[in-house]
Curated annotation (Swiss-Prot):
Coiled coil segments of this chain: none
Superkingdom, natural source: Eukaryota
Protein name in UniProt: Mitochondrial import inner membrane translocase subunit tim16
Major location category of this protein: mitochondrion
Gene: un-4
Position of the signal peptide: none
Keyword Membrane part of the UniProt annotation: yes
Segments for region (Disordered): 119-141
Any one GO MF annotation of this record: protein domain specific binding
Sorted UniProt keywords: Membrane, Mitochondrion, Mitochondrion inner membrane, Protein transport, Translocation, Transport
Natural source organism: Neurospora crassa (strain ATCC 24698 / 74-OR23-1A / CBS 708.71 / DSM 1257 / FGSC 987)
Family the entry assigns: Belongs to the TIM16/PAM16 family.
Subcellular location field: Mitochondrion inner membrane
Domain comment, as recorded: The J-like region, although related to the J domain does not stimulate ATPase activity of mtHSP70. It nevertheless mediates the heterodimerization with the J domain of PAM18 and is therefore essential for PAM complex function.
Amino acid sequence: MAYRLITQVVVVGSRVLGRAFAEAYKQAAASSQYQRAQQKNGNAATGRASLTSGMTLDEACKILNVNKPADGTAANMEEVMERFKRLFDANDPEKGGSFYLQSKVVRARERLEAEIKPKMEEKQAEEEVKEGWNPKIYKDR
């Protein structure tokens, strides 16, 4: 009689684990399919940043209380860094803050940096091309 009970527990347990693994696989497949679709649509930077930080651009903007970066300007980055420093210090665990909130603030900054920096670099490259190449010539006396 005990062997029947043990066998039944093993069978039911394996069914539960099998279903859990199947569900986890479905979720992972759907997530990777979504990321591939994002990259195909031209949101490659968005997809990469979302993968690394696990946060959307809207969520990052809400956490740091900044507007969405329309164009990658230094002013946007300065505002992001200002808000980041203030919120990071306010949520310091040694001062009674929350480590979880502090990590969310860090992830939000990383997400916004991933969005703004490529635009800033592109702008700088365009400005350099516009100005032309001006080598520095050193004259001896």
